[in-house]
């Protein structure tokens, strides 16, 4: 009888562990990657309504509370460290601002600058506004789009991708 109880206990532990792992996996954000033209299925140029079909939890900022007219920057629900910028109701830029989310080539905030330079040959460097000389923007243009790495103390601080004009914004929607 004791052996049977041990087997039941072991089976219950396996079921519990499997259920816990499945629940944790269900809560984990999809492994979407950032490219100059988008983040996972979210593509630069998509209207807000189309993005919202893919991310129903996404809520626009009321117009009277937006930092500037026609521009809205929102955290991406289910993706910690990711923000979306909409200009005139279309997705124009995606920001990565903490470790975790990565580019299609594996770079994330917190990585050494040297790794980004090796991974993205031909990055053009420019001084960051308001910052020290060794803090730079490293940018690669891809047609109408670009990807930009903001550096600080030898590391990637933030990554921006999207339309060339919006990737150049230094202060988000301001």
Language model feature labels by segment:
Residues 2-11:
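Bacterial N-terminal signal peptides that target proteins for export
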Residues 10-19:
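Bacterial N-terminal signal peptides
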Residues 20-25:
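Sec/Tat signal peptide C-region and signal peptidase I cleavage site
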Residues 35-42, 100-107:
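Second-shell loop/turn segments in exported
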Residues 172-174:
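Short, solvent-exposed mixed-charge patches
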């Amino acid at each position: 009888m004791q052996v049977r109880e041990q087997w039941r206990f072991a089976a219950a532990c396996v079921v519990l562990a499997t259920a816990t792992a499945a629940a944790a996996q269900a809560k984990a954000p999809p492994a979407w990657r950032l490219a100059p033209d988008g983040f996972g299925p979210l593509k630069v140029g998509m209207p807000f309504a189309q993005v919202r079909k893919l991310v129903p939890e996404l809520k626009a900022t009321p117009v009277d509370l937006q930092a500037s007219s026609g521009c809205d920057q929102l955290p991406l629900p289910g993706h910690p460290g990711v923000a979306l910028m909409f200009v005139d109701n279309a997705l124009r830029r995606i920001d990565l601002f903490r470790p975790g989310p990565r580019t299609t080539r594996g770079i994330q905030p917190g990585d050494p600058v040297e790794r980004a330079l090796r991974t993205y040959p031909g990055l053009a460097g420019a001084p960051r506004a308001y910052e020290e000389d060794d803090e730079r923007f490293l940018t690669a243009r891809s047609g109408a789009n670009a990807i930009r790495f903001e550096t600080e103390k030898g590391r990637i601080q933030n990554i921006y991708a999207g339309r060339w004009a919006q990737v150049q914004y230094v202060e988000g929607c301001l």
